[in-house]
Amino acid sequence: MKKYLLFVLVAFLAVTSASAQMRIRMGKNSPIEKLGRAEIAIANLYVDSVDENKLVEDAIRGMLEKLDPHSSYTTAKETQAMNESLNGSFDGIGVQFNMVDDSLLVIQPVVNGPSEKVGIIAGDRIVAVNDTAIAGVKMSKEEIMKRLRGPKGTIVNLTVVRRGIKDKLSFRVKRDKIPVTTMDAAYMIRPGIGYIRLGSFGMTSHKEVSVAMDSLKKKGMKDLIFDLQDNGGGYLQTAAKIANEFLEKGDLIVYTNGRTAPRQEFRAEANGRWRKGKLVVLTNEFSASAAEIVSGAIQDQDRGVVVGRRTFGKGLVQRPLTFEDGSEIRLTIAHYYTPSGRCIQKPYKKGEREDYAMDLDNRYKHGEFTNQDSIHLSDSLKYYTLRKHRVVYGGGGIMPDYFVPLDTTKYTKMHRLLTAKSIVINHSLKFIDAHRQELKSQYKDFGKFLATYEVPQSLVEEIIADGKKEKIEPRDAAELAQTKKYLSIQLKALVARDIWDMSQYFQVWNETNEIVMRAVKLLTTGK
């Protein structure tokens, strides 16, 4: 490690920066030479032993912290986990699970996945992996996942407890590639109006959205609500492909510009397949990066309108620079700009990450989430859309065409605490585990469930009682009534998710989402 650091730094920078024609200044007083000497001196001369790997990692993080808020360093393990969520697959056994009473409860096996193929079903409890008990031993979720995952083709032996069967069951599961979907929901929210919710922009997102659009068109969709609320972004190429489907060939989607990265434009490569029909894009303060690229392009090209609240404002182009050990630097090299010229990135000061991290809190305190008039926009931030020349504003993030305030009264403090303490989800999972077959038998059709099912009030009362044990109590009768009302809806959505899928969850929950309902009103009434 002693002399290796200097070599690695030079070789790494020489390779990764060649395309930008950057020059590394070497010599007795060069920054790189100084950094290498410092590390070697500490490793060899410091009074106590040091972890050289941690020393170098901390030095890298220290340098990046002086830059913009999003340049970052991740370890090999962190990099792998981050990439898996976007790359479309990972190797494993293919189950969605949750921990209940210190045991692993299977929520759903992945369709055609390794576990479903050998007969594992929803409601099974996995109690041992390769003869190692995982139930009743206080094992972390991360440790359990490590035991369940493994290279494709390898075998894992599972011991399962199934409701109604006295003896434990044994399954021999061959690990395989497990798809990671990024689309949360797709359904007809009203006659003629389709709804798609995308959670992130991953490798498979364009295909997922394409399949959903084709399916919804067959069901009579003429207009679309494209929900990007809470979408934290993902791959630029995926965002460009999806935006392309709504635009005409040659339309500008986004461009980038930076000190060492000259302007690069991303345009629609062909006429999109979904250019007709009204389009409403939904955003909120947690919509970021690729979600802002798509919503900004749709708005600037006058293809549709944006409904909701101002987006996060993350518009930095980052280049991944990977080390041989799998760790990675993600270095900001440019900014994203919408077709009208708005910079998506909100303002920041180099090195002041704490202030930047408090931005959403400050926006909330200043009333931006609840009152549109609290957002003060100067004429210098004024831009115009490309076709209808409507006024839109820059300054960071995408400002919606139709503002929807955050309802701060809907979820009471009591409700938030019951959810945060996992009291709601734990009771929900136990209830579903006990009544799964009964519910499946009674509600073979989701439409019937949506229209007629009501959560037993005894379940709500059990949650309230457990909350009381944790000193979670209502301020008054009004708060208790409000808490019970939305607990019932939340529990119905959770039951729908675990009996069917996330799409059914959102079909229940969206009827209480003000931004979604505003979009429905806009498409049905025109105002």
Stretches found by the model and what they are:
Residues A20-P31, L35-E52, T75, L105-Q108, ...:
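Cleft-lining beta-strand/loop regions that shape enzyme active-site pockets
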Residues V127-A128, V254, V305, R330, ...:
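Hydrophobic beta-strand signal
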Residues C343-I344, Y348-K527:
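Conserved functional hotspot residues or short segments at active or partner-binding sites
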Residues V305-Y337, K350-Y364, T370-L377:
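Flexible, acidic/glycine-enriched loop-and-adjacent beta/alpha segments
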Residues V129-N130, V161, P347, G395:
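Residue-level recognition of conserved beta-strand edge/terminus positions
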Residues G123-R125:
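Structural motif
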Residues Y46-I107, G153-A185, W509-V520, K527:
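Extended, small/polar residue-biased N-terminal targeting/export presequences
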Residues M1-K28:
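Bacterial Sec-dependent N-terminal signal peptides
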